[in-house]
Amino acid sequence: MNVTIISVGKIKEKYLSDAIIEYSKRISRYSKLDIIEVADEKTPENPSDVEKSKILEKEAERILKYLKKDSFLITLEILGKELTSEDLAKKINDLSISGKSDITFVIGGSLGLSKNISEISDFKLSFSKMTFPHQLMRVILLEQIYRSFRIISGEPYHK
């Protein structure tokens, strides 16, 4: 299994970088993992709808450069489908069994994702109806991917 995470924006906080490094190491026992950071656009305070749209489109162009044609695309979206950890593990396992050996997760920037990216998504995943900082979302996603591989492998995990 190959897992790619495309994320808008850089991680600036050391504690988040440390967590990302740790979960990346743990996941490497089960899967090849690539994390791709694309630059975020500077967002003015109180942007207009037109400004928001332009920002999302610029970020989408950067994301599109890294999407692989045969990868199963999962976008993280507040209006996506909420899954339990077991459901996510099943989804990943089912994809593997059906011959999909490549999964790409996309995390948008502070304004979310462009419709252009959302529309080509194979699956829209939501972790919560709440909003999280996109930098923290990367850590949460990595932890859930790691947990999924442990569940798939029949290994113990914290419930």
UniProtKB/Swiss-Prot annotation:
Q: What gene name does this entry carry?
A: rlmH
GO molecular-function term, one example from the UniProt record: rRNA (pseudouridine-N3-)-methyltransferase activity
Task: Give the EC number(s) under which this enzyme is classified.
Answer: 2.1.1.177
Keyword S-adenosyl-L-methionine listed:
yes
InterPro entries documented for this protein = Alpha/beta_knot_MTases, RlmH-like, tRNA_m1G_MTases_N
Q: Does the keyword Nucleotide-binding apply?
A: no
As its record notes, the protein acts as a catalyst of: pseudouridine(1915) in 23S rRNA + S-adenosyl-L-methionine = N(3)-methylpseudouridine(1915) in 23S rRNA + S-adenosyl-L-homocysteine + H(+)
Gene Ontology cellular component? cytoplasm
Its function?
A: Specifically methylates the pseudouridine at position 1915 (m3Psi1915) in 23S rRNA.
For binding S-adenosyl-L-methionine, which residues are annotated in this chain's numbering? L76, G108, F127, S128, K129, M130, T131, F132
What is this protein called in UniProt?
A: Putative ribosomal RNA large subunit methyltransferase H
Q: Which family does it belong to?
A: Belongs to the RNA methyltransferase RlmH family.
The record's listing under SUPFAM superfamilies reads: alpha/beta knot
Organism in which the protein naturally occurs: Methanococcus maripaludis (strain DSM 14266 / JCM 13030 / NBRC 101832 / S2 / LL)
What keywords appear on the UniProt entry?
Cytoplasm, Methyltransferase, rRNA processing, S-adenosyl-L-methionine, Transferase
Cellular location(s): Cytoplasm
